[in-house]
């Protein structure tokens, strides 16, 4: 009887995977049915249910190993049986390493879950992530901006026409004219950061770049997203600002774990946690920022929120309050932490390679000025930033799509419908097929001379497949604020390197610092980055 029930349940569930709620209802209904039919005491019913679930688990494991459509794809044996393999890697903060390791071990296509594949094929990337690519997978159901409001952010929308409408609204906030309007705020916050650095220099102390860049991106994010001095209304000191960023990291880490099993989301939200207070404080912060700016209305304040309050010119659609709240959370997270991550990695790599820093400083000092148009034309500056994003993409293992009805043939491989496919830009960016000496920081690979020499025979044949670089993601889901991020990063780098010489603080361990970075949806850098700043004799401030 138990075997029959478990076999029937498996036959049903493998065709339509239940949600956590549906499975709980199934268990409760079955318990009630057993108690009525068998007239057994409660303890006996519990034992029967345990036996049934054990048999069901064995049947599922055997099916996934030997009869599942994805059995032909290699991968870790545990990953074929349970999503717990990738969940464990996410919990340990090493998903980016895992995706790279399995690609090197098993090849282009690897099974990383019972119904999920990972690929490092750039041909598959362009097909699946392109303009006519596949819809987003279930990992977006536990998206970072799917909060208590119930609304979808532009990041978590799965419906492609709806996403296109939302992107048109967002695009207005990042036109060249709109971006130029954010420049005064960036310049003011840069001056504030330089003043703090000068104070630390006078004390003879090192500067924690993790703290200073964190406060800088917090202030600029608040100014550009919600209006001038918006962040100061809630966080007046550096400690307050950095605390918000730390709390944000806790939220990001939680989402980075549960997105591998989205049905865990309501359970995790309800589960008591030592970080619950921090997560709630971050939610209150984003809610307060949203409500404060919403109540101000359109007005003359041309911040990002001004454009989000407008309508789509093609359809006349306006965002609902729940959608605005979700997009506000997205603004806070992607507007701050991703920029800080790239800048921290950038300065770490330059400090580890002083010859590259000297070459970049020479280019900056020779520039006619440090305006955004002038900086955008500096080839070596752009090369160093690109190389940083190649080695340390701020969102390193998070692109998931789902195969549409009818299945598909990609690169000669039959992909069944409903199969999730994941891309890791960290793994692809470090693939020797696409980049020579892929593990090394070599900004010269991006210079025009190196590109012109591609394919030339010599001591070493340079490989640079630009299709394999997607630091700002790719396709319809690519970063809408890419040009703003470029401008902000160039200005920060140029301002610091034309005013100071940098060196590691005494006792600072760059290897241990880099080893402390974890990926949980985004790349998280939380340890202090102690750097000695020496003012240049002629500063360009």
Curated annotation (Swiss-Prot):
<dbReference type="InterPro" id="IPR036396">
    <property type="entry name" value="Cyt_P450_sf"/>
</dbReference>
<dbReference type="GO" id="GO:0020037">
    <property type="term" value="F:heme binding"/>
</dbReference>
<comment type="similarity">
    <text>Belongs to the cytochrome P450 family.</text>
</comment>
<dbReference type="GO" id="GO:0004497">
    <property type="term" value="F:monooxygenase activity"/>
</dbReference>
<keyword id="KW-0560">Oxidoreductase</keyword>
<dbReference type="InterPro" id="IPR001128">
    <property type="entry name" value="Cyt_P450"/>
</dbReference>
<dbReference type="InterPro" id="IPR050121">
    <property type="entry name" value="Cytochrome_P450_monoxygenase"/>
</dbReference>
<keyword id="KW-0479">Metal-binding</keyword>
<keyword id="KW-0408">Iron</keyword>
<feature type="binding site" description="axial binding residue">
    <location>
        <position position="479"/>
    </location>
    <ligand>
        <name>heme</name>
    </ligand>
</feature>
<dbReference type="InterPro" id="IPR002401">
    <property type="entry name" value="Cyt_P450_E_grp-I"/>
</dbReference>
<protein>
    <recommendedName>
        <fullName>Cytochrome P450 67</fullName>
        <ecNumber>1.14.-.-</ecNumber>
    </recommendedName>
</protein>
<dbReference type="GO" id="GO:0005506">
    <property type="term" value="F:iron ion binding"/>
</dbReference>
<dbReference type="GO" id="GO:0016705">
    <property type="term" value="F:oxidoreductase activity, acting on paired donors, with incorporation or reduction of molecular oxygen"/>
</dbReference>
<keyword id="KW-0503">Monooxygenase</keyword>
<dbReference type="Pfam" id="PF00067">
    <property type="entry name" value="p450"/>
</dbReference>
<keyword id="KW-0349">Heme</keyword>
């Amino acid at each position: 009887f138990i075997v029959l029930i478990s076999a029937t349940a498996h036959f049903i569930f493998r065709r339509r995977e239940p949600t956590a709620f549906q499975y709980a209802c199934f268990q409760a209904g079955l318990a009630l049915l057993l108690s009525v039919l068998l007239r057994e005491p409660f303890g006996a019913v519990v034992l029967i249910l345990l036996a049934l679930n054990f048999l069901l688990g064995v049947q599922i494991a055997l099916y996934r190993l030997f009869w599942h459509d994805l059995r032909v794809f290699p991968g870790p044996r545990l990953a074929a049986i349970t999503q717990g393999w990738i969940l464990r890697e996410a919990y340990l903060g090493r998903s980016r390493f895992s995706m790279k390791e399995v690609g090197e071990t098993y090849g282009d296509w690897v099974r990383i879950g019972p119904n999920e594949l990972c690929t490092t094929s750039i041909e598959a990337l362009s097909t699946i992530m392109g303009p006519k690519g596949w819809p987003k997978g279930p990992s977006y159901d536990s998206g970072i901006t799917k909060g208590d409001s119930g609304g979808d952010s532009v990041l978590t929308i799965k419906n492609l026409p709806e996403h296109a409408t939302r992107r048109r609204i967002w695009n207005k906030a990042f036109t060249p004219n709109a971006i130029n309007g954010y420049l005064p705020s960036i310049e003011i916050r840069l001056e504030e950061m330089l003043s703090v650095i000068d104070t630390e220099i006078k004390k003879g102390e090192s500067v924690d770049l993790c703290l200073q860049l964190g406060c800088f991106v917090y202030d600029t994010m608040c100014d550009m997203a919600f209006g001038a001095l918006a962040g100061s209304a809630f966080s007046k000191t550096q400690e307050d600002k950095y605390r918000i960023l730390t709390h944000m990291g806790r939220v990001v880490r939680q989402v980075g774990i549960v997105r591998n099993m989205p049905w865990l989301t309501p359970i995790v939200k309800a589960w008591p946690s030592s970080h619950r207070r921090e997560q709630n404080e971050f939610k209150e912060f984003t809610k307060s920022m949203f409500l404060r700016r919403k109540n101000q209305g359109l007005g003359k304040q041309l911040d990002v929120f001004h454009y989000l309050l407008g309508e789509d010119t093609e359809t006349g659609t306006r965002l609902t309050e729940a959608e605005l709240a979700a997009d506000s959370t997205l603004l806070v997270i992607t507007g701050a932490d991703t920029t800080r991550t790239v800048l921290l990695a950038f300065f770490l790599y330059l400090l580890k390679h002083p010859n590259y820093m000297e070459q970049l400083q020479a280019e900056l000092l020779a520039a006619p000025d440090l305006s955004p148009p002038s900086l955008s034309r500096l080839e070596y500056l752009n090369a160093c930033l690109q190389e940083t994003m190649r080695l340390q993409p701020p969102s390193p293992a998070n692109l998931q799509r789902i195969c549409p009805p009818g299945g598909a043939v990609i690169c000669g491989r039959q992909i069944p419908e409903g199969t999730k496919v994941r891309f890791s830009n960290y793994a692809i960016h470090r693939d020797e097929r696409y980049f020579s000496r892929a593990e090394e920081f070599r900004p010269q690979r991006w210079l025009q001379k190196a590109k012109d020499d591609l394919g030339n025979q010599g001591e070493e044949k340079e490989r640079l497949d630009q299709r394999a670089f997607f630091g700002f993601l790719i396709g319809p889901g690519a970063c809408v604020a890419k040009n703003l991020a470029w401008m902000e990063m160039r200005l920060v780098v140029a301002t610091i390197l034309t005013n100071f010489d940098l060196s590691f603080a005494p006792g600072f361990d760059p290897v241990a610092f880099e080893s402390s970075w974890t990926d949980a949806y985004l790349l998280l850098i939380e340890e202090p980055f102690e750097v000695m700043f020496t003012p240049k004799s002629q500063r360009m401030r």
